[in-house]
Amino acid sequence: MVATILDGRMLSKKIRTNVSEKVSLLKQEGITPKLVVILVGEDPASQVYVRNKRKTAHALGIEAVDIRLPENVEEDELIRLIDELNSDGTVHGILVQLPLPKHINENKVTHRIIPEKDVDGFHPLNIGKLFMNIPGPLPCTPRGIMEFFKEYDIPVSGKRVVIVGRSNIVGRPMAALLVNSDATVTIAHSKTKNLAEVTKQADILIVAIGKGEFIDENYVKKGAVVIDVGMNRNNDGKLVGDVNMESVSKVASYITPVPGGVGPMTIAMLMKQTVELAERSVAGE
């Protein structure tokens, strides 16, 4: 068996085309969707992510504004800026690029964004809606992963899913989305005993642990669907996932590559969600 590649670049292009059409319709009503990204400090990876978001947004007709603040900015100043953006009627989505410097409380800052402009889907109210299966903004990476299942006709209902990683950005919201779609979900993490025994039970294995090429074929059931959320650099400086692609693609039925898998889908979902927030603001929701 050689795994079918779940092509995030191809699928994200399809989604971006749809987003672009929706932007055109909004502009006919005099509304330009606007996304504001706040970047604190000079983290090189964060700068690349922000640049990619801006470039993608502009290509789709979304107004994207970067606000760059120095590393030593006071938390109060950042909070004041978010308050201003919350009350600005022309802004539809607000995103604070993580990580933030140590002296700033990430939760306090991200929770300050009002739920109606929480384009990342991290506000406790939106997370609560997710767990109660009420529509609202969703964390972009889990939402992008669900799009793979839809596009490639991969059934989720009744399937056993193992998620390795319990972060608030991927693991936990991913579990909620899957439960809402009638999957049976296990979350594994660094304290899980006999990890391979757990992961080998998975019909769908989602890996988000930040350890380069950690998962090999010994962790994967034959015919499983494998979603690799990891982004790591190996010793040669090459971008790799948390899954050993060469090894696992021999046993999996489907697999996402790194790069070109989950990454492009996350940005596509961010754009889609920005436009959805603009649509909701027009509808007065």
UniProtKB/Swiss-Prot annotation:
Gene3D superfamilies hit by this protein: Leucine Dehydrogenase, chain A, domain 1, NAD(P)-binding Rossmann-like Domain
Q: Which UniProt keywords apply?
A: Amino-acid biosynthesis, Histidine biosynthesis, Hydrolase, Methionine biosynthesis, Multifunctional enzyme, NADP, One-carbon metabolism, Oxidoreductase, Purine biosynthesis
Q: Does the keyword NADP apply?
A: yes
Reactions this protein catalyses: (6R)-5,10-methylene-5,6,7,8-tetrahydrofolate + NADP(+) = (6R)-5,10-methenyltetrahydrofolate + NADPH; (6R)-5,10-methenyltetrahydrofolate + H2O = (6R)-10-formyltetrahydrofolate + H(+)
BP term (GO), one: purine nucleotide biosynthetic process
Which Cys-Cys disulphide bridges does the record give?
A: none
What terms describe the molecular function in GO for this protein?
methenyltetrahydrofolate cyclohydrolase activity; methylenetetrahydrofolate dehydrogenase (NADP+) activity
Q: Tell me which SUPFAM superfamilies the record gives.
A: Aminoacid dehydrogenase-like, N-terminal domain, NAD(P)-binding Rossmann-fold domains
Instruction: Provide the E.C. number(s) assigned to this enzyme.
Output: 1.5.1.5, 3.5.4.9
Q: Which residues bind NADP(+)?
A: G165, R166, S167, S190
One GO CC term of this entry?
cytosol
Subunit field text:
Homodimer.
- Function field: Catalyzes the oxidation of 5,10-methylenetetrahydrofolate to 5,10-methenyltetrahydrofolate and then the hydrolysis of 5,10-methenyltetrahydrofolate to 10-formyltetrahydrofolate.
Can you name this protein? Bifunctional protein FolD
Q: Which organism is it from?
A: Ligilactobacillus salivarius (strain UCC118) (Lactobacillus salivarius)
